[in-house]
């Protein structure tokens, strides 16, 4: 399940992969273009995270992402314009063939679980198997526990989640798309880590 996408602003969603905006040599729109893939079970709030990051919006109206959607946002890191193409993948098994094709070329991956759902946390292992199969060996990862505003319904203790992430040497943090908690920080952290790992021209 996902949030209904906004129709306004530069963060509008599209399922058409030809809608990218590329800078030219004479009028560059950005210094670096990064592709980030957001994966995880259906209903963990992936679309809501993108909507919050791209448009600073949240809606309680839910629709399932069909296939793959994306949003674009340009940020500044160390004086450089970084354009982020953030891909929101469907969590349902029936879209697996479609979504796994988008792993190729991804610079970073955010694996999302719902802190109120132990099943979604346990699914991280399955998602990481797909990452190992389809993504570049150099892809950087971030595990995110979303919906931390629902702490009273928490099913996944952060200490347990952090121990799991530490064993895999993957950073982890918790977010709330509804309350806009650490959403920007999550995407910016991953983008910063990718930038640091990329050879500078």
Curated annotation (Swiss-Prot):
Q: Which Gene3D superfamilies match?
A: P-loop containing nucleotide triphosphate hydrolases
> Region Disordered: start and end of each range?
1-20
The record places the motif (Effector region) at: 62-70
Give a short account of its post-translational modification: Although this sequence lacks the C-terminal cysteine motifs subject to isoprenylation in other Rab proteins, it does have N-terminal myristoylation and S-palmitoylation sequence motifs.
Which Pfam family is one of this chain's hits?
Ras
Where on the tree of life does the source sit, at the highest rank? Eukaryota
Return the GO cellular component terms, semicolon-separated.
Answer: endosome; Golgi apparatus; lipid droplet
The UniProt entry's GO biological process terms, in alphabetical order, are:
hypotonic response; response to bacterium
SUPFAM superfamilies registered for this protein in UniProt = P-loop containing nucleoside triphosphate hydrolases
The lipid of kind S-palmitoyl cysteine is covalently joined to 3
Q: Lipidation, kind N-myristoyl glycine: residue numbers?
A: 2
User: Which residues of this UniProt protein bind GTP?
Assistant: 40-48, 58-65, 88-92, 146-149, 176-178
Report a single Gene Ontology molecular function: GTP binding
Q: Spell out the CDD domains in the cross-references.
A: Rab1_Ypt1
Question: What keyword terms does UniProt attach to this protein?
Answer: GTP-binding, Lipoprotein, Myristate, Nucleotide-binding, Palmitate
Q: What family is this? A: Belongs to the small GTPase superfamily. Rab family.
Q: What is this protein called?
A: Ras-related protein Rab-1C
Protein source organism: Dictyostelium discoideum (Social amoeba)
Gene name tied to this protein: Rab1C
């Amino acid at each position: 399940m996902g949030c209904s996408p906004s129709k306004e602003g530069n963060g509008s969603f599209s399922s058409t992969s030809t809608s990218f905006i590329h800078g030219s040599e004479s009028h560059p729109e950005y210094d670096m273009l990064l592709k980030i893939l957001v994966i995880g079970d259906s209903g963990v709030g992936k679309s809501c995270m993108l909507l919050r990051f791209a448009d600073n919006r949240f809606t309680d109206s839910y629709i399932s992402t069909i296939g793959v959607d994306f949003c674009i946002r340009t940020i500044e890191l160390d004086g450089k314009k970084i354009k982020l193409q953030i891909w929101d993948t469907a969590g349902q098994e029936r879209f697996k063939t479609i979504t796994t094709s988008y792993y190729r070329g991804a610079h970073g991956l955010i694996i999302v679980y719902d802190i109120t759902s132990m099943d979604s946390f346990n699914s991280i292992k399955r998602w990481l198997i797909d990452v190992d199969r389809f993504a570049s060996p150099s892809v950087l990862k971030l595990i995110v526990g979303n919906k931390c505003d629902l702490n009273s319904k928490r099913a996944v203790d952060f200490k347990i989640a952090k121990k799991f992430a530490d064993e895999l040497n993957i950073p982890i943090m918790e977010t709330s798309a509804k309350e806009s908690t650490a959403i920007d920080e999550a995407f910016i952290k991953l983008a910063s880590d990718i930038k640091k790992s990329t050879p500078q021209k």
